[in-house]
């Protein structure tokens, strides 16, 4: 097909100069050979076509790159908006968490206060229980001491005659009263006035055992 096209181009490119010359020789196949001028023109035409094709191809590539750039530019704002949306969402979540923490903190404070009050109540209850325990132990000790004395009295009564004990007590009282009178008289003889109350306090005696009256400064059953 190229040879046919070249033949047509050769017939079209004949100049008057060429018409005056002898007819070109034909090849064995019956086709007329291409002249040097036609080959040069065909080479230039082919080079121009190749150049235009390269320019068109480059323009196509540039157009595709521009389209991709436009697509990327259209996508970037969307991605930016998505990131902004995500950031806003995270901020909202943080605000919600802060609000929840704010609402929970009074409850937690109330729980802490209730726990502290419960601890104080437990401590007070333990202190009261401890005080009650000490008081009961003291009462038990007093009762045990009273019971011990009653047992001793019962034992003495079972072993001794009460009338004899009463007689001994009366004898001890009268002898003690007499001794105190004699001491008072002895101090008075030396020029020292001493009362019976001072003598009783000096010896550590009890008034009710001696039947002594401090108001009258004398024994009431002498």
From Swiss-Prot:
Localization, per the record, is:
Nucleus
Annotated coiled-coil positions are: 130-155
Name a single GO cellular component: Swi5-Sfr1 complex
UniProt entry keywords in alphabetical sequence: Coiled coil, DNA damage, DNA repair, Nucleus, Transcription, Transcription regulation
Region of interest: Disordered: 16-36
| GO MF entries | transcription coactivator activity
Q: Determine if Chloroplast is one of this entry's keywords.
A: no
Spell out the Pfam families in the cross-references: Mei5 (PF10376)
Q: Which GO terms describe its biological process?
A: double-strand break repair via homologous recombination; positive regulation of DNA-templated transcription
Q: What is its main location?
A: nucleus
Give residue spans, biased composition: Polar residues: 22-35
Task performed by this protein: Component of the SWI5-SFR1 complex, a complex required for double-strand break repair via homologous recombination. May act as a transcriptional modulator for ESR1.
Quaternary structure (record)? Component of the swi5-sfr1 complex.
Q: What is this protein called?
A: Swi5-dependent recombination DNA repair protein 1 homolog
Organism for this UniProt entry: Gallus gallus (Chicken)
